[in-house]
Amino acid sequence: MGQPAPALTPLPFELVEDDGEFLETEWHVQQLPLLRETILRAMAEMGRTKDYYTGTNMFVYYSVEQAAEVAREVAENLEPKAFRGPDVFWVSGVHKHRRKYWVAWDEGGRLPDLIIELLSPSTARVDRTVKKDLYASVFRTKEYFLVDPDTRKVEGFDLAGRAYRPKAPTAEGRVWSSQLRASLGFWHGVWMDDEDDWVRLFHPDGSLLLTKAEAAEQKAGMESQRAEAAEAELARLRALLDERSRD
C-alpha cells in the first residue's frame, strides 16, 4: 500500500470520478445524505462552517499507484480490487469547497480524520479487514465506525499506534465520536418518506441532532404553541373584563 506522495505533473492517466458501481440497497442510498446533513449540522452547532470537508461515496486517492490501478481496472472493465473510497469521510482543517474526488497529494497529504462504512453482506469482510488495516496504517484515520443495518449495531474504533482500539458503546448502543462531538446510534423514524431504522447523531445529553427540516418543524411547532397560549391568555383576560363590566 503506497503512502501519500507528490504526484507526477501531469499524471499519465485521468483520475476516475465514477466507476458505475451502485450502492447495495435503497437503505444505503438514503442513509448517506442523512449522515452528511447531520454532520454538517453538528459542525454548524460548533460554529464551524468552512474549515472541514465531508464526503460521501467519493473516490479517495492516497497514492499515485493506487490511482493508476483504479484507472486501469475501469478502462479494462476489470473486477474492482483497488481501493475506491469509504462511504462517509470527514477531514478537519481543510477548505470546504466542492471536490470531484479526494486527492491526498493535492491536499497537502491530508487523509480522512473520521470514516464511516455502511456494512453489507458483500462488503463486510473487506470493511472489517483490508479497509480497517488501510485506514489505521496508511490513512492514520483517528476514528473508524462500522454500521450494520441488519443487526442495527454501530461499532467504533480509536486509532492507537497503527491499529484500532474498540470504543465502548452506551447502554443504548450509541458510540461517541470525539471528532464530531456527538454519538452515532440507530433511531427509528421517517427519513425521505421511509420509516426505518436510521443511523443518526446524538448530542452529549442524548438528544437527537435534528436535520434542517426537523429543526424547522420543531420551531414551527413551538411558535404555534406560543400563539395558542397567547390566544388562550387573551381569551381569559377578555372573559375576566366582561365579568367585571357586568358587575
Model-found features: residue ranges?
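A structural signal for short, well-ordered beta-strand segments and their strand-loop junctions
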Residues: Y53-G55, F145-D148
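C-terminal interaction segment
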Residues: M1-E24, H28-V29, P33-A44, V60-P86, ...
